[in-house]
């Protein structure tokens, strides 16, 4: 699931990451 939150699980802080 594509997420646009910061410091989301499985993603880089401050950037748009993916929810895995």
Curated annotation (Swiss-Prot):
EC number(s) on file: 3.4.21.32
Keyword hit for Coiled coil: no
Location of the Peptidase S1 domain: 1-20
Reaction catalysis annotation: Hydrolysis of proteins, with broad specificity for peptide bonds. Native collagen is cleaved about 75% of the length of the molecule from the N-terminus. Low activity on small molecule substrates of both trypsin and chymotrypsin
UniProt keyword annotations, A-Z: Collagen degradation, Hydrolase, Protease, Serine protease
Gene Ontology terms for molecular function: serine-type peptidase activity
Identification of the protein by name: Collagenolytic protease 28 kDa
């Amino acid at each position: 699931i594509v997420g646009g939150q910061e410091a989301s699980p499985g993603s880089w802080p401050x950037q748009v990451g993916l929810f895995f």
